[in-house]
């Protein structure tokens, strides 16, 4: 998913950075409030960031000029809400760009918009809808992580198509081509990420009722 350094036109790089900015600011405010009101949630915040860092660093090269990998943002999104992952995701992407040459500084805004904003918002929305539909916590978390991951790659496909539309079929044709290439590796990875996220939630929360697990992780219950 990480679009490599210098791959996007300058105007696109700036535009995606400006689009991501307000979400990151809102996330910083949310994190500050969480830490002030629930200091015990700091460990889970750190674990959410580490989970995203490790999973999104497992990259599989793709011929689209990007790569495929799990995103790991679903965990933090379902526990703390999507705005928190905007900040954690940017930190993850920045470290990966500087230390692993994964992504880049000029494409940080675009990568953040797809992985740290769209993915977490979709994951959070799916989790809420699944819960209201009567799904168990495990099913809701799985669907959230699975669809949040896929939403990230759909967004990246659209970003790449906007930058490089197909000469014949235009934006839609390019988006379908980028998306189809990602899908070969990403659908299996998204399924695996869904199962792994459920396992991690269970491991971090311990042996408590499903309805209390996320509240405990978020520092809202003891």
From Swiss-Prot:
The chain crosses the membrane at residues 9-29, 43-63, 75-95, 107-127, 134-154, 160-180, 181-201. InterPro entries: CbiM (IPR018024), CbiM/NikMN (IPR002751). Belongs to the CbiM family. It holds the Pfam family CbiM. Pathway: Cofactor biosynthesis; adenosylcobalamin biosynthesis. It is a multi-pass membrane protein. One of its GO terms (biological process) is cobalt ion transport. Part of the energy-coupling factor (ECF) transporter complex CbiMNOQ involved in cobalt import. The complex confers cobalt uptake upon expression in E.coli; can also transport nickel with a very low affinity. A Cbi(MN) fusion protein has about 70% import capacity, but the holo-Cbi(MN)QO complex cannot be isolated, suggesting CbiN may destabilize it. HAMAP family: CbiM (MF_01462). It comes from the Bacteria. Its main location: membrane. It is found in: Cell inner membrane. It comes from Rhodobacter capsulatus (strain ATCC BAA-309 / NBRC 16581 / SB1003). GO terms for cellular component: ATP-binding cassette (ABC) transporter complex. This is Cobalt transport protein CbiM.
